[in-house]
Structure formats: C-alpha cells, structure tokens
Swiss-Prot record:
CDD domains given in the database record: M20_bAS (cd03884)
PANTHER family according to UniProt: ALLANTOATE AMIDOHYDROLASE, ALLANTOATE DEIMINASE-RELATED
Reported cofactor(s): Zn(2+)
Cofactor binding comment, as recorded: Binds 2 Zn(2+) ions per subunit.
Keyword annotations from UniProtKB, A to Z: Hydrolase, Isopeptide bond, Metal-binding, Ubl conjugation, Zinc
Family classification: Belongs to the peptidase M20 family.
Organism: Mycolicibacterium smegmatis (strain ATCC 700084 / mc(2)155) (Mycobacterium smegmatis)
Protein name: Putative hydrolase MSMEG_3995/MSMEI_3903
Length: 438
C-alpha cells in the first residue's frame, strides 16, 4: 500500500507489516514502569524515566539515528538527509504522572520515532533527498508532577524559562533537576539546536492522546488542534498557627487546612459560575505537620484556571482573589502567593492545520478541529516554528489515570497520519507559515 499522491515529491510507502512493527515496539515501551492496575509510574528524572530514555536511545541508534542530549535533558535522535539543512522536529515526552496512564506522551515519542524511521527507509530505498532533515525529541519533564513547572524542557528550549532556574528547581525531597538528571546520565553539555548555530529548526509536529471526549463522541479518529487554552497556575501557602485538635477552642483556631479547603470550594464555585468555558482545579495539597491530632499550621497548594476566553479568565482570576481574601478572614489565616505560571491561549498556524487535514483526507482518515485544554510541548514550540498538533481518541476521556486507554487501531492510524504529515513538512509544505500565533 502507498499513500496517495500529495503536493510534495516525498511519498512514504506503507507496507502491510507497519502496524505490527509499531505495536511490538509499543509493547516494550509501555512495560517500563508498569503498575499492577495497567498504568505507569515514571516521573521525570527517576530511574524509570532513565530506563525509558535508555530504551529510546537504543531504539534510535539501531536504526541509524545519532542521539544527543541538551543541558536541560531533552533527548534528540537525529537523521541527516541534507547536510546543512534545517530539521523538522517530531516528538512528545516520556515522563508520566504518579500512577499515570501509559499512553500520555510516550505514544507521541514512539509515533514520531516511527514516522521518522519510515522516512529514513524510503529515502534509503529511493535515493530521494528531502529538503529538510528530521529529528525526534523526548522533552524533559513535560508533566510537572515531580518538578514545577510543567513543560520544563520545551520551555527552556524555546527561551521562556531560564536554564539555571530550571536546573536548580527541587522536588518535595529537595532533589534538584540538575542532580536528578545527572543520576540517570541525562544531562548534556551543549545545545543540540540553536537559532544561530549549525543546526536549526524548520517545523515541529506532535501527536498525543486527546485526554477528552470530543473525538470519541463524534466517532472521529484524528483531532486537528487549532488552538490551545490559556492557563493560569498558582502556588499558594496558607499560613495559620499549629494547635491541638482537642484542646484548642474552635474560636481560637487559625486553621491553615480550613483556609485551603475554602479556596478549593471557591474554585468549584467559580467554575460553576462561569460555565463550561472555564476549568478550575486544585491538584496538590501539602499539609504541615500532617498529624491527626494537630491543627495544621501551613498548607502548600497548587491551583489552576484554564479557559479559551482571555476576558473570562481574567474575571475568574479576580473572583478567585476575592474568595482567597474571604478565606483569610473566615479561617484566620494568611495566604502567600508564592509563584504563578501563565500560559496564554493562542492559535496554531492555520497552514499546519490545513496540511494535516489534507493529509488525513488523502489517507481516508476522519478528522475534525479541536482545541486543547491541556498544555503540551507544542504549546511552546508553535511560538518559534510552524507547528502541527494532532490528537487520537481517549476512551471515555480518561487521562492522568491508570485506566487511560486508546485502541491499537487509533494508535496505528495516528502513526500513519503523522508519517504523512512529517513527509510533507520535510518537503517544505510549511515554509510559508511563520512562527508565533496568527
């Protein structure tokens, strides 16, 4: 079987064994860090993350890729077809949430690697030289569960996060990113790509599970991501006074956990008030001293607000700040705003969306426009190079959980489409698209 003729000269034959080859590799990859309930545990910089990276490095090297790592731990597999030409970069991330899903991120890395390798095989057989080279990437610490913020590797790569600040970031046990990467031999000594160096980028592509239900509800195989939601993420410290849960009178308590609980309830109230255009969450609470007979003196909490409407997001932010002030009075506590990370919502380049739509139509794969409410590394990358973001369906929309699932059929269809998208990008189909948002 051969993909239909497209607007480029690069056509990637799809042989009948292509799905089996991908699925066999996928079975090896998803077994690393596997949990009894069908998920995975491989947070950034852990031994399991190191095992994933080692597996990927071996897979790439045996297929002729050169493997390099940059100073923040992003791992690249490079294929040079046209010496001196820029690269099309494709990939995602290998790290996971605690007891997370096995498809989130890792699918996109392997799919990108397979797409690049299929291109290599075609170039070797045909003698055709693409306009650009191709590289695969595993972005370090996309999830942000062990080290904050999320999308750390791509943020450093795109210049929105300082390298030293990222390397000095510590987890809850005081281990720094620098030390965690060193422990898994995952830190490089020089940049792999640079806007002024010998290696530059032409475009970026990423495929990911949807982590929602739009594709499933519409019985569609591929989501063409045209916009990312904005996100405001906050770290708060709620500070009270430690006391005895039995002896301290209720009216005398300055209960940090009560203050935090009021803020959590406020988040849900705000979501209900603003409707489906706003998502609010509190995903992590650290309670001190966390004793059953002690009124908590301090709670560290992580919150986020997300929306595709900037005005609505600003209004929700103002509402949250009012409710925080009310919680301070009600609980007799002080709330310290430690840090905030803000990601604006922007459109992906329309030329990339159309390229992917045309490729899906040519392959006979159903597609539809979708937005991403979750952050992805392409959120950062689209600001510096033309970028394409694709989704495959998530059964029941479950993600960041061990029950996360995408069918083999949808996984393989996604790899086929990504292969064709990368082929068209390698032949310059996005040359007219600029970086940033329209």
């Amino acid at each position: 079987m051969t993909v239909p003729v497209n607007a480029t000269n690069l056509r990637i034959p799809l042989d009948t064994g292509r799905d089996r080859e991908f699925l066999d590799s996928w079975a090896e990859l998803e077994a690393i860090g596997a949990t009894p309930a069908g998920g995975v545990e491989r947070q950034a910089g852990t031994a399991e993350d190191g095992q994933m990276r080692d597996w990927l490095s071996r897979w790439l090297r045996t297929r002729g890729f050169s493997v390099e790592v940059d100073p923040i731990g992003n791992l690249f597999g490079l294929l040079e077809f046209n010496p001196g030409a820029p690269y099309v970069l494709v990939g995602s991330h290998l790290d996971s949430q605690p007891r997370g899903g096995r498809f989130d991120g890792a699918y996109g890395v392997l799919a990108g690697a397979v797409a690049a390798d299929r291109t290599r095989r075609y170039v070797t057989r045909s003698g055709f030289t693409p306009r650009y080279n191709v590289a695969v990437v595993d972005w370090f610490n996309e999830e942000g569960s062990r080290f904050k913020p999320s999308m750390m590797g791509s943020a450093v790569f795109t210049g929105t996060l300082d390298l030293e600040e990222a390397l000095n970031t510590t987890d809850d046990d005081g281990v720094s990113v620098r030390d965690a990467l060193a422990a898994i031999n995952g830190i490089g000594d020089r940049e792999v790509f640079s806007s002024t160096g010998p290696r530059q980028l032409a475009a970026y592509a990423e495929i990911h599970i949807e982590q929602g239900r739009e594709l499933e509800k519409n019985n569609v195989t591929i989501g063409l991501v045209d916009r990312t939601w904005a996100a405001n993420k906050y770290e708060l410290n709620v500070v009270g006074i430690q006391g005895h849960t039995g002896a301290t009178a209720i009216e005398d308590r300055q209960d940090a956990l009560l203050g935090a609980a009021l803020i959590v309830v406020a988040l849900r109230d705000i979501a209900d008030e603003f409707g489906e255009e706003l998502h609010t969450s509190c995903g992590q609470l650290t309670v001190l001293p966390n004793s059953p007979v002690v009124v908590p003196r301090e709670v560290h909490m992580h919150l986020d607000l997300r929306s595709d409407n900037d005005e609505l997001l600003a209004a929700a932010d103002a509402a949250l700040r009012r409710r925080i002030a009310e919680a301070e009075i009600r609980a007799g506590v002080k709330v310290e705003h430690r840090k905030a990370h803000v990601w604006p919502g922007h459109h992906y380049q329309p030329q990339g969306v159309e390229l992917a739509r045309d490729a899906a139509n040519d392959l006979g794969i159903s597609s539809m426009l979708v937005q991403t409410r979750a952050g992805h590394d392409s959120t950062n990358m689209k600001e510096i190079v033309p970028s394409v973001m694709l989704f495959v369906p998530s059964v029941e929309g479950i993600s960041h959980a061990e029950a996360e699932y995408t069918s083999d059929e949808d996984l393989c269809s996604g790899v086929d489409l990504l292969t064709e998208v990368v082929a068209r990008m390698l032949d310059g189909s996005l040359d007219a698209a600029g970086a940033g948002h329209p």
